[in-house]
From Swiss-Prot:
Biological role: Negative regulator of class I heat shock genes (grpE-dnaK-dnaJ and groELS operons). Prevents heat-shock induction of these operons.
Organism of provenance: Synechococcus sp. (strain RCC307)
Name recorded for this polypeptide: Heat-inducible transcription repressor HrcA
Any Pfam family the entry gives: HrcA
Ranges annotated as spanning the membrane: none
Signal peptide: none
HAMAP family linked: HrcA (MF_00081)
Listed GO MF terms: DNA binding
Length: 330
């Protein structure tokens, strides 16, 4: 969209601010009085009419004032977003002093999700960091009685170990299996279909153990932490059961779907109404930002609320929390 004339920018910004604060349509006289616009009500009324023609404002009823449309919110977010308020500045200060003092990652994520929800009155979502199946760089096989200890070195510089039972009379195969596996890893990944037949008795259970190890870590990483649903339900837009039921089902059954998959590899952003691909969110807005960990994991921080959202606060808060997670988990 082409840039708006200055007067229309002022009127759109004031209309959005009024509607976010009051949930009430607004007329030209109220805008002039409340926001001190340097124009007469007639001039502001003309600007509102022009904005309505452009699809940025809409009139719910003939006798009512005007409210922003989804297109109007988009214009506001892209071009007219004000500086975040004092509450976000305070949050940024708190986060700057935050250190990794939690015994478990989930404790940290819960703390930050709750802080976001309390600050904004919206529902917050933080996904646990996901990463691709780690690529093994090398491994070592060590016999201990009737057990096999497997020490794994990954591409992320992390290490881990497995412990499995050895088949009888397999000691002679261990050195050959270790050599074959590390030769495979030096090229790319293990091609188990090429495992020599005389190594199958030890190689097959090791293959199963490695697969189970990776599945377990992926399950541990899955999931999204959500909080603030009660605050979201207090919003006037979600008072009707018919509009609320699809959203509640999504939160309960598929919280990951609340996030826009288009942001998975992007810088994050804002999705308003039907810009989001999931129909249950067609009446909502989602503000989202990514974070990354030192091991290559990626997660998202998001807020979900009505389109009538304090976007400056929401976007700044989400970006601050995502940045803090990237810093703490680096």
């Amino acid at each position: 969209m082409l840039p708006l004339p200055r007067r229309q920018q002022q009127v759109l910004q004031a209309t959005v601010q009024h509607y976010v604060d009051t949930v009430e349509p607004v007329g030209s006289r109220t805008l002039v009085r409340r926001f001190g616009l340097d124009a007469s009500p007639a001039t502001v009324r003309s600007a509102m009419g022009a904005l309505e023609q452009k699809g940025l404002l809409t009139q719910p009823h003939t006798s009512a004032g005007r409210v922003p449309s989804p297109k109007g919110y988009r214009q506001f977010v892209d071009a007219l977003l004000p500086e975040p308020g004092a509450a976000v500045v305070q949050l940024q200060r708190e986060l700057a002093e935050l250190s990794l003092q939690w015994a478990a990652l989930d404790d940290l994520l819960h703390h930050l999700a709750r802080r976001l929800a309390d600050l904004t009155g919206l529902m917050s979502i933080i996904t646990r960091p996901q990463r691709q199946e780690p690529r093994l760089k090398a491994l070592r096989l060590v016999r201990s009685g009737d057990r096999l200890l497997v020490f794994l070195v990954e591409s992320s510089a992390a290490s881990s170990s497995l412990n499995l039972r050895l088949p009888p009379d397999s000691s002679a195969q261990l050195q050959a299996l270790e050599h074959w596996l590390n030769d495979q890893l030096s090229k790319s990944a293990i091609n188990w279909s090429g495992l020599p037949s005389h190594l199958q008795s030890v190689g097959a259970p090791l293959k199963q153990a490695l697969a189970s190890h990776n599945r377990g870590r992926n399950r541990q990483a899955e999931g999204a932490l959500t909080t603030g649903l009660a605050g979201l339900l207090c919003q006037p837009e979600f008072q009707l059961t018919t509009s609320l039921r699809p959203l509640l089902q999504l939160v309960e059954q598929q919280p990951h779907e609340l996030l826009n998959p288009a942001a998975a590899t992007a810088s994050g952003g804002v999705w308003i109404g039907q810009e989001h691909p999931h129909p249950a969110l067609s009446g909502c807005a989602v503000v989202q930002a990514p974070y990354a960990t030192a091991s290559g994991g990626e997660g998202s921080v998001a807020l979900v609320g009505p389109m009538r959202m304090a976007y400056a606060t929401a976007l700044a808060a989400v970006e601050a929390v995502a940045g803090t997670l990237s810093r703490l988990l680096a």
